Amino acid sequence: RDPEMSRGLGDVYKRQIQYFGDNLRPYWNREGNETIVSQFQKAEKEYKTQMKNSAAFDKKLMEEATAAGGRKYAELCALAYRQALAAHKLVQAPNGDLVFLSKENFSNGSIGTVDLTYPGAPLLLYYNPELVKATMNHIFYYSESGKWAKPFAAHDVGTYPLANGQTYGGDMPVEESGNMVVLAAAIAKVEGNADYAQKHWETLTTWTDYLVENGLDPANQLCTDDFAGHFAHNANLSIKAIMGVASYGYLADMLGKKDVAEKYTQKAK
């Protein structure tokens, strides 16, 4: 079957994602007053303008990437742009949050996986930090709603297209907690404020304390390379935990919590 046709048909359905029991429309039809036909008509009407905008964006991306690392690096960035954005669905949660959900295509179909969010984040941080938040909002909600009661970040929120709670059998406590705290700090760095972290401070504190207690010499845990299985004393996880604790200290400093910042920065060191 034609994958492009399948992708197009996916956007015809009125409610594509089930999010903790609520069936959500795609973002382009979040109010329920659009049709795929109206979108095709809009695309036809705006075709020349959007193609011009696309060409200008492509040119800018290649120029900036070439300046940063040369032509071969720029070509990798062009590939990475598509790769990082593929297999995501943008919806609006009932509480108004943007939610940008990934799908694992060649493993188990998990939706909203944190260790997929993390490596794709640099692209979104550069072009649209609000989309980084949108890749994190569902994980924060999962914990803060009480639906996920463990003291570390969840791995995912279900199996696409059902985002009703983690279905993957193996937690990644240090991996995902570290990822979430580091990403919160990256958002603060880019935006020049820690407002997003402040909104989720209690949850970030819980996850960071888990990293302090369990991250330096991790026990038998999975990491993002889960095909390797569980193993202890994972140096990569240890580094992830250290960076997570340091990131929390950085956020605390931005929020004026000087004693907290000093405490956690020293723990990271």
Where are these regions (language model features)?
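Single conserved hydrophobic/aromatic residue that forms the stacking wall/gate
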Residues: 3-9, 13
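Short glycine/proline/serine/threonine-rich loop/turn segments at secondary-structure transition edges
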Residues: 15-18
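Short linear capping/connector segments at secondary-structure termini
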Residues: 222-229
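Carbohydrate-active enzyme catalytic cores, enriched for enzymes
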Residues: 252-269
